[in-house]
């Protein structure tokens, strides 16, 4: 399955919530009607969505937020289910620990897609070594930094400046001047913002 390359705002409208695909720290709410489905007149049917439909919709939403395709998402769920603890929370922790997401959370990329591009273009170092695998799992204590020759990129500086204004998550420590950060630990469920109901995904895969 190919990765979606169409209008990002349309995906947010389809899910009825801002997926932060277009702009990481600026809401789409003022720019488009998130409660109206894509199309000339939006969805007009008043039919109630089935439980299965809601579960499937939630899975699609989370896949789009993190930019993960179906096969990879299934692997994440299998690993989350294998681990001790709450499966839904484990799933979100695995997704949040992806290198591209950590780069985004540290403010080096204004969106996860931009962060993924930085990783793919070898602009990111992990513990001093170049790593260009967006899905790589980052562990507690890992240091993620911008490669020296990439530090002059205007988009990185602008993204970091905005991230400093809005604040960084408590589970990463960022030195904006050095353009590097430390992944302190995987976030607790309460640390993960966003309109996500992971229990629906667990129910879907438990059918």
UniProtKB/Swiss-Prot annotation:
Q: Which UniProt keywords apply?
A: Ribonucleoprotein, Ribosomal protein, RNA-binding, rRNA-binding
GO term, biological process aspect, one: translation
Feature: compositional bias, Polar residues: 42-53
A Gene Ontology molecular function term for this protein is: rRNA binding
Q: Which cysteines are joined by disulfide bonds?
A: none
Looking up CDD domains in the UniProt record yields: S4
Q: Does the keyword DNA-binding apply?
A: no
Region entry Disordered, spans: 33-54
**InterPro entries named in the record:** Ribosomal_uS4, Ribosomal_uS4_bac-type, Ribosomal_uS4_CS, Ribosomal_uS4_N, S4_RNA-bd, S4_RNA-bd_sf
Query: Is Transmembrane given among the entry's keywords?
Result: no
Q: Where is the S4 RNA-binding domain?
A: 97-157
A GO cellular component annotation in the UniProt record: small ribosomal subunit
Xref: PROSITE patterns: RIBOSOMAL_S4, S4
Instruction: State how it assembles.
Output: Part of the 30S ribosomal subunit. Contacts protein S5. The interaction surface between S4 and S5 is involved in control of translational fidelity.
Q: Which HAMAP family match?
A: Ribosomal_uS4_B
Q: What does this protein do?
A: One of the primary rRNA binding proteins, it binds directly to 16S rRNA where it nucleates assembly of the body of the 30S subunit.
UniProt record similarity statement:
Belongs to the universal ribosomal protein uS4 family.
PANTHER family referenced in this protein's UniProt entry, alphabetically: 30S 40S RIBOSOMAL PROTEIN (PTHR11831), SMALL RIBOSOMAL SUBUNIT PROTEIN US4M (PTHR11831:SF4)
What protein name does the entry list?
Answer: Small ribosomal subunit protein uS4
